[in-house]
UniProtKB/Swiss-Prot annotation:
Name listed for the protein in its UniProt record: Cytochrome c oxidase assembly protein COX16, mitochondrial
Statement: the UniProt record of this protein carries the keyword DNA-binding: no
Function summary: Required for the assembly of the mitochondrial respiratory chain complex IV (CIV), also known as cytochrome c oxidase. May participate in merging the COX1 and COX2 assembly lines.
Keywords: Membrane, Mitochondrion, Mitochondrion inner membrane, Transit peptide, Transmembrane, Transmembrane helix
Disulfide bonds: none
Gene Ontology CC: mitochondrial inner membrane
Membrane topology note: Single-pass membrane protein
Residue ranges crossing the lipid bilayer per the database entry: 33-53
Localisation per UniProt entry: Mitochondrion inner membrane
Signal recorded as keyword: no
Family statement: Belongs to the COX16 family.
Amino acid sequence: MSYSGNRVFRGKKEQEAYDKTLAGRYVKLVKKNHFLFFGLPFLVSIVAGSIYLQKFTSVKWEKYDEKYQQLGEEEMLNLIENKRTVDKKNDYYRLQGLLNDHTNQVADDYEIVRVQRRKEDEPVWDRQ
């Protein structure tokens, strides 16, 4: 058996012996119908591998979803250790500065007084 380029040269007896082997019969079938004996098994193996590996990829994405899942507002509040109860009315007054946290009383240390405008800043419809 000698090599000339990329083809193998076999003598008559060697070729007959090769044709009787599994590889020889397969090469002959591939030459007759290459899609049926080469392309189709390749595509089937790709699809079967995808279906077989689907379990592993689903586990991978489930772990990813567990790690990066969006938490709802109540779930976030449950994660906080030193949480206080939420009361809309008290929080509104506390944020406005009207309620002292330590005494829970309304602060009466100021009055709301309207600042006098300059004459030229008065609305036009009031001028006569």
